[in-house]
Swiss-Prot record:
Residues 1-20 form the signal peptide. It comes from Schizosaccharomyces pombe (strain 972 / ATCC 24843) (Fission yeast). This is Putative ERAD-associated E3 ubiquitin-protein ligase component. Residues 621-655 are annotated as: Disordered. It holds the Pfam family Sel1. The lineage of its organism: Eukaryota, Fungi, Dikarya, Ascomycota, Taphrinomycotina.
Length: 713
């Protein structure tokens, strides 16, 4: 098998020599090192954005249907030298077989590395990013921080063409919506349905109420897009001009003609501060769109005219934008005095864009310390370009900080973690999470692990037995949790401890689980970590039974999170009942055994019911085998010992007789339906009880009213 892999390597190295390299060696500059030459850019372009550079949601949307429909075709395209197909094949070999996606590529790190190298020689963005992550973490390649940070820098500057220097304030989704919540769909503010309702409300308010703020809000949604709502520049321009037209009536529908009309026929100044602010926002954004080429060809003169209108309304960002244009030498020669004066006025208003422009000016003058101060202020306000400049400043002197800023910049520009994936169907969303996780995005690693985590269902881990499918999913989840835990993510450390405690995806190792919980509690006080430590001390799992230490850890859990009050109260009661000094201890142990027997009976009852309902036997309930590649398209499958992850294999002896005796497991039952049915049954019972009590209360009130009427009569 080693000889086979060696021959395959030689084959692909030979093919690399004869492939046509698209684009050659990639050369890059910092964003806006030199002015944009309007004549060199086609109409509709945006800073000469390369068509090959896509955000991750766009890449997944375009490629996932092709992978599911005909993975062999994608493999053939990779053999022909297509860099995108080579990257996708490399990721499939890195991820291994996935029955949920219907993809059966074997896990083969050597082949994955070969395809990545082939794609990277053509400067394909995502291949370079994947190699950078592998070099930094020593995944299937020797660890090299210098090589990793060098590749991160190359990727960051390669995708800088997607950044709009003046108006690109991309939110840091990972910071605003941490995956510690474990379910992004609960983020109601980003619900697609809610966004649609807001858009309809704003339309009605803007058109019927002639409200300038509603027009600005609608234009913002159409300019930048939202989950489930694509960008529409024409509608954005329409609403920006509609907002301006409420004050400057009669202006044309063309941005260039509109600004000429405003300059030739000046109207009265806005009557309120809110109106002036809305007008200045519209003027500033129209200027940015003109400069960035979103209105056609990049037009610095038109942009300058709109920025001047914003300055006349005392808009600080418009002042910073004109200072930026003076600095870049767009419509006029560089004017140091004008730059200084405009920036001083904008900085006095604490304008984020002013800090970004001031940082760039300081960088050009060699004032690194002053530039760092200004750029960090801009970064704290969400300015995306400044993140790249800070990363460049730290490059070579502080690789740790440089890597952190490069990762942040790349993740936000390529949208490696974004709420847009909420609108994807479950399979596409799962593929996006796994692909982003392989590229090193922390939040996606946690979501990819959660997608395959068998411990997320209480019924699945308590009532139903574990089997090979459960352990296979657990190993995939454990792989991603391990990558996140290596970056000190608290919940991932706790999850790995759970897997070792329960023996999911690995043999049960309570002592190792205890060490993971202790590490999580030491890095950052976590109520869940303290709760797990208390539970292990209470039951003597991995450590001797110690009620005092259990109580101490339970108290720490309550101290760090008041939501643990009920759980801690029940734990204290449980310890009091199970204490050897209490005469309740024997009763408590008997109740525990009865409960366990009841769960086993429920387990066997459900399994037997499905056996009875399946006349062809339990094997007929198994999902179909995923489609495989044709023999002539796929290399030979490698030896599992050569490609297995550094994760312990499950100890089948510890699974018990349930693995061999129970033929049909929960993994082939619609788990969501079963859990939903159980919860619905509980809700119905509780609802009936409450309804009955309410009816009795109403009947009692009615009787009392009748008695009072009779007494008055």
């Amino acid at each position: 098998m080693q000889l086979l892999n060696f021959l395959i390597c030689l084959f692909f190295i030979f093919k690399r020599c004869v492939f046509t390299v698209i684009g050659g060696e990639f050369s890059y500059d910092n964003i806006d090192k030199k002015p944009i030459l309007v004549a060199s850019y086609p109409e509709g372009s945006r800073f000469n954005v390369s068509a090959s550079i896509k955000t991750l949601p766009d890449l997944v949307t375009l490629t996932f249907p092709k992978l599911v429909k005909d993975p062999g075709y994608v493999y053939e395209e990779a053999e022909k030298g297509d860099p995108e197909s080579q990257f996708l094949i490399a990721m499939l070999y890195a991820m291994g077989p996935d029955e949920r996606l219907g993809l059966s590529f074997p896990r083969n790190e050597p082949l994955s590395r070969i395809f990545l190298e082939l794609s990277a020689t053509q400067n394909y963005t995502y291949a370079l990013l994947a190699l950078a992550y592998k070099h930094l973490n020593g995944l299937s390649t020797p660890m090299s921080v210098d090589k990793g940070v060098e590749l991160y820098k190359q990727v960051a500057h390669q995708i800088s063409c997607l950044v709009q220097p003046l108006s690109h304030f991309a939110p840091d989704i990972a910071a605003e919506y941490p995956v510690d919540l474990y379910d992004l769909s609960r983020t109601s503010s980003y619900s697609v349905q809610k966004k649609d309702d807001i858009v309809e409300y704003l339309k009605d308010y803007a058109l019927r109420g002639n409200n300038i703020s509603a027009h600005i809000s609608l234009a913002t949604i159409y300019q930048y897009g939202t989950p489930g709502k694509l960008k529409d520049i024409k509608l954005a321009v329409k609403h920006y001009l509609a907002a301006i037209r409420l004050v400057n009536s009669g202006i044309p529908d063309s941005p260039s003609e509109a600004i000429k009309s405003i300059h030739n026929n000046p109207r009265h100044a806005p009557t309120t501060k809110e109106t002036a602010n809305s007008l200045s926002i519209a003027a500033f954004r129209l200027g940015c769109m003109a400069l960035h080429g979103e209105l056609g060809k990049p037009d610095p003169s038109l942009a300058y005219a709109w920025f001047e209108y914003g300055v006349s309304l005392n808009h600080s960002s418009s002042k910073a934008a004109i200072a930026y244009m003076y600095f870049m030498g767009y419509p006029v020669a560089e004017n140091t005095e004008s730059i200084t004066k405009l920036l001083e006025n904008a900085l006095a208003s604490n304008d984020p864009l002013a800090f970004a422009v001031a940082g760039k000016v300081s960088l050009a003058n060699g004032q690194i310390d002053e530039a760092t101060v200004h750029l960090i202020r801009a970064v704290s306000n969400g300015h995306l370009e400044s993140v790249l400049h800070i990363a460049d400043i730290y490059y070579g002197s502080n690789n740790q900080l440089s890597i952190a800023y490069y990762e942040n910049f790349i993740s936000r520009v390529l949208e490696l973690f974004d709420v847009k994936t909420i609108s994807f169907d479950p399979l596409t969303r799962h593929f996006a999470h796994r692909l982003s996780a392989e590229l090193g995005n922390l939040m996606s690693q946690i979501l990819a692990a959660k997608d395959r985590d068998p411990s997320t269902s209480y019924l699945k881990t308590v009532i139903f037995p574990t089997n090979e499918q459960t352990h296979r999913n657990a190993r995939i989840a454990m792989n991603y949790y391990s990558r996140a835990a290596a970056r000190n993510h608290i919940h991932s450390l706790i999850k790995i401890g759970d897997f070792y405690r329960m023996g999911l995806g690995t043999s049960a190792k309570p002592e190792l689980a205890f060490s993971y919980y202790s590490q999580a509690a030491a890095i950052h006080p976590s109520a869940l970590a303290y709760w797990r430590l208390g539970w292990m001390h209470e039951y003597g799992v991995g450590v001797p039974v110690d009620f005092e230490m259990a109580k101490k850890n339970y108290d720490n859990a309550l101290m760090h999170d008041t939501r643990a009050f009920l759980a801690v109260t029940l734990a204290r009661l449980r310890m009091r009942l199970s204490s050897p000094d209490s005469w309740f201890s024997n009763i408590y142990r008997i109740l525990g055994k009865v409960t366990y027997k009841f769960l086993k009976l429920v387990q066997y009852f459900i399994i037997n019911i499905f056996d009875i309902l399946s006349p062809a036997g339990p094997d007929s309930q198994l999902p179909p085998e995923p489609p495989t590649l044709q023999v002539d398209r796929t290399p030979q499958q490698p030896d599992p010992q050569e490609t297995s992850e550094s994760l312990p294999s499950p100890n089948t002896e510890e699974m018990g007789e349930s693995y061999n005796d129970i033929r049909f497991t929960y993994d082939y039952i619609d788990g969501r339906f079963l859990e939903t049915a159980c919860v619905t049954l509980i809700v119905v019972v509780v609802g009936l009880v409450l309804m009955r009590r309410h009816q009795q209360h109403r009947l009692q009130e009615r009787r009392e009213r009748i008695i009072r009427r009779q007494n008055r009569a």
